[in-house]
């Protein structure tokens, strides 16, 4: 009996209890929840349904809890149901009913935990979208990990997800990048507002290798040559870094295409039709204050050039015309103002602002020997994705960045995350998987085969704790997807790994010496197989490897 099965049983039972007493069943919540008590002595699961419903139907919650407990005790699979406190019901599940979870996991395999909760959603997930003027910095690296994990997580719940990178190749930052390349190619100092770092010299040399006469061209042609070749080279490096990090995108959209394809003009025309823009001081303004923004925004500057928000408007319109019903933007800590701005832009275009969702990620700091690490050797300024991977590896880098809520700044201790110790969270989880894999190999050598026929033999309290935690995995995925919080998967896996290690220390899985394999060995091996599957499924969502050996 899974937590979902128990919740369904509880709702059915509550409906019958209320109906029998001529009480209003409409008072029942659409979704009934059960929770695992912190204290195991309080049972396997608990519910506060009587507290939710009692006053609505004019019954003392504790009395209603008593009715529910009496009815539940008679239900198949329920070992006991007891009233606690002002109206809680504590439940214990019969081992045979509870242990069905193990068979469900083995049968479902890599699809265990998946659901159709978001099957109707067509989601555009835009993340990283770093300027093509340098390597991806540590903040963008956080989004590369979290965004990719979120995309995988949403997909487990049935959503159609497109991972998109918005390529900012239009604007002043590209002009500064080009000036920096040309200065490096000429052997001149970096311009005052330019980009430093050895990568600039590397790219400048590659531009000259592709077009040896680039510096001899007229100024306009020279700049265009360095722009076209240099931006492509930089973006190729970014794509390779992301791919090596385990993050790939379905779509790359060029900001410049919004301006060259007529998308910006189309968006402006839509705004004019909606009466959402006006002229002032020679510029064209968007009435974003009418839709919740803190001030109106310039769309077309007084010199006739589109402002940055013009591209944002066109890009949102483009996404909606491609059929996405939810557009998630994952932005850096300095973009809080974009939440109201993007929602206002959607409303001004005549769309539902709830089709826009903005996630803001906080800062990431690296620490070595108790001191902050601030300088990248290659970029010359901030720490990059490549720096982090070089220091602790892809798995530890991804896990460390996903493990905390995105609205929390994080410090990554390089010594901790590169250590082979239980204090290293990713090592702790991966070691559990490797230990389970070794157990499977040893079982094969001994001729022990996992069997779900006698799961009723799994009655040890450590077995029950592990099984109940395995049953939580679908709910963890559903809530993590709904809340856009993939860090919940990390915390769950660490908790599950702990339950497994405690089970393994208390319950011998394989026969020893001349002992013949028995049904209990087979049932425990099935439990280990299910645990290994769930850990592998969780790590796959995070984009972290599940090693067979460590």
From Swiss-Prot:
Q: Which InterPro entries match?
A: aa-tRNA-synth_I_CS, Arg-tRNA-ligase, Arg-tRNA-synth_N, Arg-tRNA-synth_N_sf, ArgRS_core, DALR_anticod-bd, Rossmann-like_a/b/a_fold, tRNAsynth_Ia_anticodon-bd
What Gene3D superfamilies has UniProt attached to this entry?
Answer: Arginyl tRNA synthetase N-terminal domain, HUPs, Isoleucyl-tRNA Synthetase, Domain 1
Of the GO CC terms on this record, one is:
cytoplasm
Primary location class:
cytoplasm
Q: Which GO terms describe its biological process?
A: arginyl-tRNA aminoacylation
Enzyme class per UniProt: ligase
Record Pfam families: Arg_tRNA_synt_N, DALR_1, tRNA-synt_1d
State its Enzyme Commission number(s). Answer: 6.1.1.19
Molecular functions (GO terms) = arginine-tRNA ligase activity; ATP binding
Q: Which SMART domains match?
A: Arg_tRNA_synt_N, DALR_1
Catalysed transformations (reactions) = tRNA(Arg) + L-arginine + ATP = L-arginyl-tRNA(Arg) + AMP + diphosphate
Where does the protein end up? Answer: Cytoplasm
Q: Does the keyword Translocase belong to this entry?
A: no
Q: Which residues form a coiled coil?
A: none
State the UniProt keywords alphabetically. Answer: Aminoacyl-tRNA synthetase, ATP-binding, Cytoplasm, Ligase, Nucleotide-binding, Protein biosynthesis
Q: Does ATP-binding show up as a keyword for this record?
A: yes
* Motif 'HIGH' region: where in chain: 130-140
Q: How does it assemble?
A: Monomer.
State the family it belongs to: Belongs to the class-I aminoacyl-tRNA synthetase family.
Q: Which NCBIfam families match?
A: argS
Write the protein's name: Arginine--tRNA ligase
Question: Which species does the entry assign this protein to?
Answer: Mycobacterium sp. (strain JLS)
